[in-house]
């Protein structure tokens, strides 16, 4: 049977499949046509994400059904050196005791007018 896969760019891919094919198998066919690795693919049908081990018939996908292909979000572990840099940039700040403005680490007075450029600053509290 024939099914359609619509990508986020609006492109529609036509695939020849059987109802007994697994979602893994469909993702492999998409990789053959589009070059997108299966581990980055997420298939959606009727508002549900399709699980790899299940078959098309499990989701009641019939001929000429349309699946939606979205890419898995990238993310994960931040490199330790970048984490230290981000921590230094975000955590080593001064806070105005009156208006709670975030100020550079070496600031002596607040930069805001609403607190009268006070010199009552404290270091930003550390995360636990």
Curated annotation (Swiss-Prot):
Domain Ubiquitin-like, which positions? 1-76
Provide the cross-link position: Glycyl lysine isopeptide (Lys-Gly) (interchain with G-Cter in ubiquitin).
6, 11, 27, 29, 33, 48, 63
Q: Where is this cross-link: Glycyl lysine isopeptide (Gly-Lys) (interchain with K-? in acceptor proteins)?
A: 76
* An individual GO BP term: modification-dependent protein catabolic process
**GO molecular function list:** protein tag activity; structural constituent of ribosome; ubiquitin protein ligase binding
Keyword Calcium carried by entry: no
Q: Which GO terms describe its cellular component?
A: cytoplasm; cytosol; cytosolic large ribosomal subunit; nucleolus; nucleus
Kindly give the InterPro entries that the UniProt entry links to this protein: Ribosomal_eL40_dom, Ribosomal_eL40_sf, Ubiquitin-like_dom, Ubiquitin-like_domsf, Ubiquitin_CS, Ubiquitin_dom, Ubiquitin_ubiquitin-like
Coiled-coil segments on the chain, per record: none
What keywords is this UniProt entry annotated with?
Cytoplasm, Isopeptide bond, Nucleus, Ribonucleoprotein, Ribosomal protein, Ubl conjugation
Show the SMART domains listed in the entry: Ribosomal_L40e (SM01377), UBQ (SM00213)
Pfam name, any one: Ribosomal_L40e
Q: Which PANTHER family match?
A: UBIQUITIN
Question: Any remaining note in the record?
Answer: Ubiquitin is encoded by 5 different genes. Ubi1 and ubi2 are synthesized as a polyprotein with one copy of ubiquitin fused to ribosomal proteins eL40A and eL40B, respectively. Ubi3 and ubi5 are polyproteins with one copy of ubiquitin fused to ribosomal proteins eS31A and eS31B, respectively. Ubi4 is a polyprotein containing 5 exact head to tail repeats of ubiquitin.
- Give the family, as the similarity comment puts it: In the N-terminal section; belongs to the ubiquitin family.
Protein name according to UniProt = Ubiquitin-ribosomal protein eL40B fusion protein
Record the organism: Schizosaccharomyces pombe (strain 972 / ATCC 24843)
């Amino acid at each position: 049977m024939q099914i359609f896969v619509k990508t986020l760019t609006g492109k529609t891919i036509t695939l020849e499949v059987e109802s007994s094919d697994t979602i893994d198998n469909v993702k492999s066919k998409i990789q053959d046509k589009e070059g997108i690795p299966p581990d980055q693919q997420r298939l959606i049908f009727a508002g549900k994400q399709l699980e790899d081990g299940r078959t098309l018939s499990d989701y009641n996908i019939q001929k000429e059904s349309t699946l939606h292909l979205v890419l898995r979000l990238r993310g994960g572990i931040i490199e330790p050196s970048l984490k230290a840099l981000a921590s230094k940039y975000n955590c080593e700040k001064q806070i105005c005791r009156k208006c709670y403005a975030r100020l550079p680490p070496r600031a002596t007075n607040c930069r805001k007018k609403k607190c009268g450029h006070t010199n009552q600053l404290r270091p930003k509290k550390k995360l636990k």
